[in-house]
């Protein structure tokens, strides 16, 4: 049976045969898709550079948030333990030296009515206590990089600074109000020179170790030793000035007030900085 013309069944075009465009429309040529490789490669350096900038700006804060100091990335384990032992030796040396100087300075303060000598004696006691806190800080070998232990030591140092500064300022103001005149002799000179030199040397050692170990407690202990050295030389300065000009009797007490206020300001700054960090790192205790 023959089929009528036009009634043939048309098979759909195969996948390889393109469908002709409708009448009245020009054939559209598809534009080739852009290659995303150059774009991604051009953006990759910027994306890599941005994390590096942010990481460099918040490097130490990131490690402290995890309970570690920045020294954990700077020092190898054996290097950290070596510097920890050096910090312990310097702290023991500081305790012995400053304790002897404190006894001598208290003797000078009582015998010669020197407010600066009293202030130095109090600062020497503070140095003994701060060095003892540093001993506790580095007594545990496993806690050499512990941020929480570091901040606790700094908070204790801040409280001691406040108490000592109050005692120094009160004693100096009392001496100024009663017009106490310091006496000058060879013993006063010997104590002031010896204390100034020894405390300055201890301060340099503590600053160096504190920088390597990134320890705020060691740096604070070094600041305290530096104040002790300045007070030792101030005893010599005020005594020499009073020897040549008795009208400047207030220099000794004024130096005592100035040093006491300096210690007070440092203690307040230390507490403001460290108390929030103790709370932040209390869940990351790295010591037993």
Curated annotation (Swiss-Prot):
GO terms for cellular component: early endosome membrane; intracellular vesicle; late endosome membrane; lysosomal membrane; plasma membrane; synaptic vesicle membrane. Residues 12-24 have a biased composition (Pro residues). The chain crosses the membrane at residues 88-108, 116-136, 150-170, 187-207, 217-237, 255-275. PANTHER family: TRANSMEMBRANE PROTEIN 163. Belongs to the TMEM163 family. Homodimer. Interacts with MCOLN1. Interacts with SLC30A1, SLC30A2, SLC30A3 and SLC30A4. This is Transmembrane protein 163. It comes from Rattus norvegicus. The lineage of its organism: Eukaryota, Metazoa, Chordata, Craniata, Vertebrata.
